[in-house]
Amino acid sequence: MSEYLLLLIGTVLVNNFVLVKFLGLCPFMGVSGKLESAIGMSMATTFVLTLASVLSFLVNQYLLAPFDLTYLRTMSFILVIAVVVQFTEMLVQKTSASLHRALGIYLPLITTNCAVLGVALLNVNEQHDFLESAIYGFGAAVGFSLVLILFSAMRERLAAADVPMPFRGGAIAMITAGLMSLAFMGFTGLVK
């Protein structure tokens, strides 16, 4: 039980996919302008990442590995991710049209979010079992969501602040992301 908790904490805080592994930077910078969009993107990404992680494990374990088709791993994982994203987009469109409009192009772009594919491939490389794959996917999603929501709140606060002209926009966003990354480095010794 403690092994699973350590995996979850390690994935969320210590090995955060955005701040440590630099995966998922496109939606991190693109959707973080408004807190409402960041929360919606976080929920959608959490759902997609967790489900894609589990389904990718199943595809690898019961389809690719037994038939020695591991060379198709990346392509099959991308297909699984695309199906999960399409399902999520239909679900969001039916349940919340305003959220669907707010997310705009970023919802279909979850398909190309390298963090989603990275989690699926790292699950295979680290030889996680089914439960570990689910926890790893969920932890990566929670870590992504945590960083995205915190960063979005900071960007909204910075938009109201008196930032010098050369630092406005992307420059102050990159400085803020760097400071967040330094703050998350404090968790490094938490999990071995």
UniProtKB/Swiss-Prot annotation:
It is a multi-pass membrane protein. Keywords: Cell inner membrane, Cell membrane, Electron transport, Membrane, Translocase, Transmembrane, Transmembrane helix, Transport. GO terms for cellular component: plasma membrane. Its main location: membrane. Its EC number is 7.-.-.-. It is found in: Cell inner membrane. GO terms for biological process: electron transport chain. The chain crosses the membrane at residues 5-25, 39-59, 72-92, 102-122, 134-154, 171-191. It comes from the Bacteria. Belongs to the NqrDE/RnfAE family. NCBIfam families: PRK05151.1, rnfA. Part of a membrane-bound complex that couples electron transfer with translocation of ions across the membrane. The complex is composed of six subunits: RnfA, RnfB, RnfC, RnfD, RnfE and RnfG. This is Ion-translocating oxidoreductase complex subunit A. It comes from Shewanella amazonensis (strain ATCC BAA-1098 / SB2B).
